[in-house]
A protein has these predicted regions:
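Secondary-structure end/capping motifs
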Residues: 228-302
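Soluble non-cytosolic domains of exported or imported proteins
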Residues: 40, 68-71, 86, 141, ...
Length: 317
């Protein structure tokens, strides 16, 4: 008579324990990263990584959360609703200077590699032809933001004294654009692609940031998230880097994503150039220090922030 092999109770327990350990490991790997983004050209690699399945390819579960304003995005990050976000150099330093443990993990875009991000424009029909001629006239901006910094630097570089720079608050970019184009304000600082749209409709370009290092865009995570998810953070950045390569090698293949996510006006959908993106890299030390110095002069932040505190270079692919 044949006998069946007996499975011992200890072996069953061992198998179950192994399964539990494996499942816990997989659960940790499958943490859903909620990452805040804006409908900005410089965020295109993130949209491409999501749309083309590159996050999944690298084993990362990512949910891109779209915000219409920087303020809304920052509130979500501070509240703990996000693990990270797309940003300029200014905002993370403001948060960090006010006690939020935010870390920059990569620079994604720099005007020195391609073209402008922001510009100061005079209204259609304006007789103002230079930033020097604009001296003392109101410019619509969003205060203590990268567009505020760009506006100030462009004026100063044009020989305008800081004391004579006149600005008016306009947080909503769409409203800022409309009030410029309808002549309700003399000038405004705007981002691309609205700069191109405004020029095509008669606004006059007075200056742009094509040579300013401070106009960088970056990716940030909370330090707590990085501490608990180092490998996941690296794979996230690897997916974004692959998206950069895809965009640069075949820009037309992602035009549909750019048109949809960046909300290009109808007149630009077929002709606006797809940006080229540099390799992911740490933010420029000099540019970051310049931003910190500007924020301290404005008394927006008061504490000293070292580059090594604000940046983690160890996660780059």
């Amino acid at each position: 008579m044949k006998t069946r092999p007996t499975v011992t109770k200890s072996l069953v327990i061992a198998c179950l324990l192994s399964l539990v350990v494996y499942s816990l490991g997989r659960a940790k790997d499958n943490i859903a990263i909620k990452f805040g983004v804006l409908p900005a050209l410089q965020a295109l690699p993130l949209f491409v990584a999501e749309s083309r399945g590159l996050f999944s390819k690298h084993g990362v579960d990512v949910e891109l959360i779209l915000f219409n304003t920087t303020a809304e995005k920052d509130i979500a990050l501070v509240s703990g609703s996000l693990q990270g976000c797309f940003a300029d150099l200014v905002t993370p330093m403001i948060l960090r200077g006010n006690g939020r443990d935010i870390v920059v993990v990569a620079k994604t875009y720099d005007t020195r590699f391609d073209r402008r991000m922001f510009a100061v424009l005079a209204k259609p029909g304006s007789e103002t032809r230079s930033l020097k001629e604009l001296e003392g006239k109101p410019v619509a901006i969003s205060s203590n933001s990268v567009v505020d910094l760009v506006n100030e630097k462009l004026h100063v570089d044009a020989g305008v004294s800081k004391d004579t720079i006149n600005t008016i608050e306009s947080k909503n970019i769409g409203l800022r654009f409309q009030t410029l184009m309808t002549g309700q304000i003399e000038a405004a600082a705007l981002p691309e692609p609205l700069v191109t749209v405004a020029i095509s409709k008669g606004a006059r370009l007075l200056g742009d940031d094509s040579g300013l290092g401070e106009s960088q865009t970056v990716l940030v995570f909370t330090r707590e998230f990085i501490k608990n998810n180092m490998d996941l953070s690296r794979r996230f950045l690897a997916a974004v880097e692959e998206a950069n390569n895809l965009i640069n090698e075949n820009p037309d293949s992602v035009r549909d994503i750019m048109v949809e996510q960046v909300r290009l006006p109808e007149s630009l959908k077929s002709q606006y150039p797809v940006p080229k993106f540099p390799r992911l890299a740490p933010p420029d030390r000099d540019a970051l220090n310049s931003v910190l110095s500007w924020l301290k002069q404005r008394k927006v932040i008061h504490s000293e922030i070292e580059y090594e505190q604000a940046v983690n270079e160890q996660l780059l692919p």
